[in-house]
Amino acid sequence: MFNTLLAVFIGGGVGSMARWLVSLKLNSASAHLPVGTLIVNLVGAFIIGLTLAFFSRMTHIDPVWKLLITTGFCGGLTTFSTFSVEVVYLIQEGKLAWAAGTILLNVAGSLAMTMLAFILVNNFASQ
């Protein structure tokens, strides 16, 4: 149990620091679209897709590694709460089209990235 908690703790810390750095560098790139939040959510969705597809085929690997990457790193990297508050700010500023676009890009984009990761792993594994 301690190893599992430690793995999630380490992964979460690294993921959170990565999110902060990406947001720090990219969120100021656009006055309307929180680019940093979008990037971390898309990258996190892709990484979790890769990880889950990989671990579903490699069942002999200790599942603590999966938790380090998925619950820890991806949980720390991605952010639904920041995404939500950024959308609320856009709505409060009357930027309804930007709010809708942000929702669409984050939700549909994250789903597409996760699906793409599964497809890539499955195609690579079948060759």
Curated annotation (Swiss-Prot):
One biological-process term from Gene Ontology? cellular detoxification of fluoride
What functional role does this protein have?
Fluoride-specific ion channel. Important for reducing fluoride concentration in the cell, thus reducing its toxicity.
- List the NCBIfam families hit by this protein, alphabetically: crcB, PRK14196.1
Record field: catalytic activity: fluoride(in) = fluoride(out)
Which superkingdom does the taxonomy of this entry point to?
A: Bacteria
Q: Which gene encodes it?
A: fluC1
Q: What is the lineage of its organism?
A: Bacteria, Pseudomonadati, Pseudomonadota, Gammaproteobacteria, Enterobacterales
- Kindly state which keywords UniProt assigns to this record, in alphabetical order: Cell inner membrane, Cell membrane, Ion channel, Ion transport, Membrane, Metal-binding, Sodium, Transmembrane, Transmembrane helix, Transport
Q: Which residues bind Na(+)?
A: 75, 78
GO MF annotations, alphabetized: fluoride channel activity; fluoride transmembrane transporter activity; metal ion binding
Q: What is the predominant subcellular site recorded for this chain?
A: membrane
Q: How is its activity regulated?
A: Na(+) is not transported, but it plays an essential structural role and its presence is essential for fluoride channel function.
- Please name every pair of cysteines joined by a disulfide bond in this record: none
- Matches recorded under InterPro entries: FluC
GO cellular component terms, alphabetically, are: plasma membrane
Regions crossing the membrane: 4-24, 35-55, 71-91, 101-121
Record protein name field: Fluoride-specific ion channel FluC 1
Q: Where in the cell is it found?
A: Cell inner membrane
Q: How does it sit in the membrane?
A: Multi-pass membrane protein
